[in-house]
């Protein structure tokens, strides 16, 4: 029989350093028991922040699921910066290489909604962009792909416009011939009368 869930909470602690406190008090979990279990499970992860989902059941037992460190943490670590840019559009806070991007994407893959490394790289690259971190080699590829997409759209629009003009030209030619025929017939009628 499945246990009745009382509460589900998502929190984040430093690996191996969770302590009883206000963030856990609101969850309703046995704090010493949870912190011991969490710290034992994350001790080997250094000082990285570890997101955790805690499910507390009505009988006061609990389960928890650990996630990978946030992509922003890994990006800051790779770029050797303390924080991202306050204005990512105008200020570059740092850079990472394409290899570092791939490593972070592969690390984050279990927590992302994709199984494809390239899609994961795009997700992590988006996070890096929001932080003002440039990905050497990737941003150039992304710009080239975007330019190709825009060029294809422009070519498609030009082709559609050309076809539209051609069909309009044919309609005009066809209608002009009819108008002339009508005019000739009407003039012949007027002359007969």
Curated annotation (Swiss-Prot):
Keyword Transmembrane helix attributed: no
Pfam families: Ribosomal_L11, Ribosomal_L11_N
PTM annotation: One or more lysine residues are methylated.
Top-rank lineage group of the source organism: Bacteria
GO molecular function: large ribosomal subunit rRNA binding; structural constituent of ribosome
Keyword rRNA-binding among record annotations: yes
Protein keywords: Methylation, Ribonucleoprotein, Ribosomal protein, RNA-binding, rRNA-binding
Biological-process GO terms, alphabetical: translation
GO CC terms: cytosolic large ribosomal subunit
Record PANTHER family: 60S RIBOSOMAL PROTEIN L12, LARGE RIBOSOMAL SUBUNIT PROTEIN UL11M
Family membership: Belongs to the universal ribosomal protein uL11 family.
Subunit field text: Part of the ribosomal stalk of the 50S ribosomal subunit. Interacts with L10 and the large rRNA to form the base of the stalk. L10 forms an elongated spine to which L12 dimers bind in a sequential fashion forming a multimeric L10(L12)X complex.
Function comment: Forms part of the ribosomal stalk which helps the ribosome interact with GTP-bound translation factors.
Protein name: Large ribosomal subunit protein uL11
Gene name linked to the record: rplK
């Amino acid at each position: 029989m499945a246990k009745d869930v009382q509460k589900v909470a998502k929190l984040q602690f430093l690996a191996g350093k969770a302590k009883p406190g206000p963030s856990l008090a609101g969850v309703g979990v046995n704090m010493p028991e949870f912190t011991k279990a969490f710290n034992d499970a994350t001790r080997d992860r250094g000082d990285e922040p570890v997101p955790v989902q805690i499910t507390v059941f009505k009988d006061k037992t609990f389960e928890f699921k650990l996630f990978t460190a946030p992509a922003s943490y890994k990006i800051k670590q790779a770029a050797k910066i303390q924080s991202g840019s306050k204005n990512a559009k105008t200020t570059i806070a740092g850079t990472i290489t394409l290899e570092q991007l791939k490593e972070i994407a592969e690390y984050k893959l279990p927590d992302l909604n994709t199984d494809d490394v390239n899609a994961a790289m795009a997700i992590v690259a988006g996070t890096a962009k929001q932080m003002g971190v440039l990905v050497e080699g990737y941003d150039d590829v992304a710009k080239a792909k975007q330019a190709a997409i825009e060029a294809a759209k422009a070519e498609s629009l030009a082709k559609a416009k050309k076809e539209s003009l051609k069909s309009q030209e044919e309609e005009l030619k066809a209608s002009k011939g009819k108008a002339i025929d009508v005019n000739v017939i009407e003039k012949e009628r007027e002359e007969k009368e």
